[in-house]
Swiss-Prot record:
Name the record gives this protein: Histone deacetylase complex subunit SAP18
Family indicated by similarity: Belongs to the SAP18 family.
Tissue expression: Ubiquitous.
Start and end residues of each stretch annotated as Involved in splicing regulation activity: 93-153
Disulfide bonds: none
N-acetylalanine modified-residue sites: 2
Function: Component of the SIN3-repressing complex. Enhances the ability of SIN3-HDAC1-mediated transcriptional repression. When tethered to the promoter, it can direct the formation of a repressive complex to core histone proteins. Auxiliary component of the splicing-dependent multiprotein exon junction complex (EJC) deposited at splice junction on mRNAs. The EJC is a dynamic structure consisting of core proteins and several peripheral nuclear and cytoplasmic associated factors that join the complex only transiently either during EJC assembly or during subsequent mRNA metabolism.
GO cellular component: ASAP complex; cytosol; histone deacetylase complex; nuclear body; nuclear speck; nucleoplasm; nucleus
Length: 153
């Protein structure tokens, strides 16, 4: 006699993020690379042990939100504090199938405006210690380049 399992989508629950006690948990070193032209760095800029020169080193936790990271970047770059400045976040990680790196856009924030991605965390986007964060900063007087996530098809 065969037994058939029927699992519905409702029964497959996402594991909730466990809250991180920042008093007891050691922070991680987040290596952040920024551009101010609205485009992410090319992947070849991360090849052979090299990284772009625009590096920020931030000590933070896996539950850091994009809004929190935006605030930290604005502390370092006063020109990014202008209302309407757009921050597009991407994780740069080692490609396990071939030599080099891959990029995964994860969300965006805007200075002076609340957005749907503000509360997104590194942990929720499968960030792993050792990955890089690439932030494309677009000044308020220029429209950000279209991202793959916003395509109508």
């Amino acid at each position: 006699m065969a037994v058939e399992s029927r699992v519905t989508q409702e029964e497959i629950k996402k594991e909730p993020e466990k809250p991180i006690d920042r008093e007891k948990t050691c922070p991680l070193l987040l290596r952040v690379f920024t551009t101010n032209n609205g485009r992410h760095h090319r992947m070849d800029e991360f090849s052979r042990g090299n990284v772009p020169s625009s590096e920020l080193q931030i000590y933070t936790w896996m539950d850091a939100t994009l809004k929190e990271l935006t605030s930290l970047v604005k502390e370092v770059y006063p020109e990014a504090r202008k209302k309407g400045t757009h921050f597009n976040f991407a994780i740069v990680f080692t490609d396990v199938k071939r030599p080099g790196y891959r990029v995964k856009e994860i969300g965006s924030t805007m200075s002076g405006r609340k957005g749907t991605d503000d509360s997104m965390t590194l942990q929720s986007q499968k960030f792993q210690i050792g990955d890089y964060l690439d932030i494309a900063i677009t000044p308020p007087n220029r429209a950000p380049p279209p991202s793959g996530r916003m395509r109508p098809y």
